[in-house]
Amino acid sequence: MSDKLNILILHRMGDPKTWRASVRDVEFCLPDYAPEHNYIVHNAAMPLPSFVKDIEFHGIVLGPTFLCNRYHPRMLAKTLKEYAFVKESRAFKIAMPQDDYDCSAILERWLLDWDVDLVYTVCPEHWDVLYPNLAATDTLRLGYTGYVSDSMIERWRRPKPFASRTIDVSYRASKLPPNFGTIGYVKGIIGDIFLEKTINEGFRLDISTNQKDIIHGDRWLDFVENSKFILGSNSGSSLLDPEGEIRFAVDKYLVYHP
C-alpha cells in the first residue's frame, strides 16, 4: 500500500504572469514542503478538467484566492455548482481564507455546507464574531496571511548592501473602495502624503498606488532588496461586512459616482 496521498489544491490566481510571490507561496505550501505526495493543483480561473471529479482524494485544500469567489453571488453560485463534488468527497478538507471580515457569514455558510474539517485563519480574538458557528466547534486553527519560505531565508543571508540600494523610500498598495473603511483608506493615501511632504527633499522615491505599477513574482523581492526604507500601514479593514451588503452598496454607488 502506497504512503502517498492524493491531494487536490484549488486556487484562483489567474494568469501566472500576474502572480504575487507571497500569495503563490501560501497556495503551493504543500507541494513545496511535502512533495512526496500526489498533487493536482487547479487554477479555478480555468475550466475544471472532468477527470478530476473521478479521482479519490485523501485531502482537498481550498486556497485563499479560491475562497474569494464568495465576493460575487454569480461567481459563488457557479463555484458551488461546478465544484459540488468537493462537498460530496470523503477527503479531509482544509480551507485557508483571508480577508475574513469581507463576506464572513457567506464564507462560513460555504465552509459548513462543504463540511470542511479545518480552517486556518487569522484574528483568533474575533473568531466568535467572524465564525460564530465554526467557533463552537474544533474546526478553527490559527493561520497567517503570509509565511517566510526557506528560499527567502536563503536569499536574505547576504542582502544587497544598504549603500548600494538605489531607492531611498518605496511603497506599493492599492487604493481600496470605501467598504474597507479607514484602514483601507489610509493604506491608499499614505504614499501620496509622503510624496507631497518630501517633494523638495531630494529623496529617490518609488511610490505608487497605480495598478499598472504592481510588481509581480520574484521581482517584488528584488524591489524590496533595492529599497533602503519602505512605507508601511495596517492591512485589512475597519468595517465588518458579513453578508457583503456594504460592498454591494459601495459598488452600486461607484457605478453612478465614480
Residue ranges of model-derived segments:
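Extended catalytic core of nucleotide-activated donor transferases of GT-like folds
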Residues: 6-137, 151-156
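Structural signal for conserved beta-strand scaffold positions within catalytic alpha/beta enzyme cores
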Residues: 41, 95, 121, 141-146, ...
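Residues that mark the start of a beta-strand
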Residues: 3-9, 166-168
